[in-house]
């Protein structure tokens, strides 16, 4: 699994570059295209005949600088890979939702599922996996805030990036 996770991370960065090269502006990426392509790639990689996992994507069509789009895509990659690997154990179906929206000057990424969720002893931030470490590092890099919620069934991750603040150097 380590190798397939690494491949997914590299593909995530590759999608940003592919999306950039399809436009005439090489410094920003269309988030809707990027997020949809990334989600479809991960869905294809984890699709099995034993499970029917629905993945819905609702992403706004704004542009983002490449140096912010890459970490955002890597966060989404880690969340989706973890969801496919852990949320639907011993289940033959499930739902994953990815929403990317603007609220005032904030870009908000929400990834939720109706899987098995976390127990209180499995608080996501306390898990010392490579994927969780990557997520926390990238959230810090984006100067964002994150929140995991789980009520025993399903998990929701929210990332808020203040675009006004993140543009200040």
Regions found by a protein language model. Name each.
Residues 139-140:
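Detector for a conserved hydrophobic position within an alpha-helical segment of the HATPase_c
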